[in-house]
Design a protein with these regions (language model features):
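Hydrophobic side chains in well-ordered alpha-helices
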Residues: 121, 157-160
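Acidic, Mg2+-coordinating active-site environments of NTP-dependent enzymes
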Residues: 1-146, 169
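Single conserved hydrophobic/aromatic residue that forms the stacking wall/gate
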Residues: 183-186, 190-193
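Glycine-rich phosphate/diphosphate-binding loops that line cofactor/substrate pockets in enzymes
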Residues: 163-172
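Structural beta-sheet core signal
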Residues: 34, 174-176
């Protein structure tokens, strides 16, 4: 959660309050699945009646946690799932980046809520190669590997650049097109990297 859509929200506190109001709409028998890597995520869960299920890469106390994270030669993640404090299965992703390990943890938490087996999840993940315009391999030309990504705010840009950092290449070139205030702010972040 970060400052985005400031044409609608006043500031970051307004954004957090909006998430909290939304979470409070969940019924008591519902589930809120939330990333503990979000700064002050408890602001969002405050006062809700639904069950809170957590996941995270940085928080070993999260209900769903990735342990023994490693990356293959294409930057695709491997990890051991820790579910409710117990080491369970190993997972191999076919998409690159730490952020996709986090996305996978969220999907595993959802699957758990619906009693979808680890084997079924692993089958689904084995065929998942990413989505259009998210670190999408476009081809090679004159010795360059072309990757397209529509990262449009600072956190996404950092995640994309982190994915690129472990991708096999000699030198990284970035073509960046800022088309909004958030993109311009992201450009400042990009220049800091």
């Amino acid at each position: 959660i970060e400052e985005d859509h400031l044409d609608f929200f006043k500031d970051i506190n307004d954004i957090r309050n909006s998430f909290n109001r939304f979470a409070n709409l969940l019924p008591e028998n519902g589930n809120l699945i939330i990333n503990t890597d979000i700064e002050n995520y408890q602001d969002i869960t405050d006062g809700i009646k639904a069950k809170v299920i957590t996941y995270g890469i940085s928080d070993e106390t999260a209900d769903f946690y990735a342990k023994n994270i490693s990356y293959d030669e294409n930057g695709c993640g491997n990890f051991t799932l820790v579910r409710y404090g117990k080491e369970t299965e190993k997972y191999q992703l076919h998409v690159s980046g730490r952020h996709n390990i986090s996305n996978c943890l969220a999907a595993l938490a959802v699957a758990d809520c619906y009693d979808i087996s680890a084997k079924q999840v692993q089958m689904g993940l084995s065929g998942f190669r990413g989505t259009e315009r998210r670190f999408e391999y476009k081809g090679e030309k004159n010795g360059f590997t072309i990757i397209d990504d529509y990262a449009h705010h600072p956190t996404e840009i950092k995640a994309t650049l982190s994915s690129a950092a472990v991708y096999p290449h000699q030198k990284l070139w970035v073509a960046f097109q800022p088309v909004s205030y958030t993109h311009l702010r992201a450009h400042e972040t990009l220049s800091d990297l």
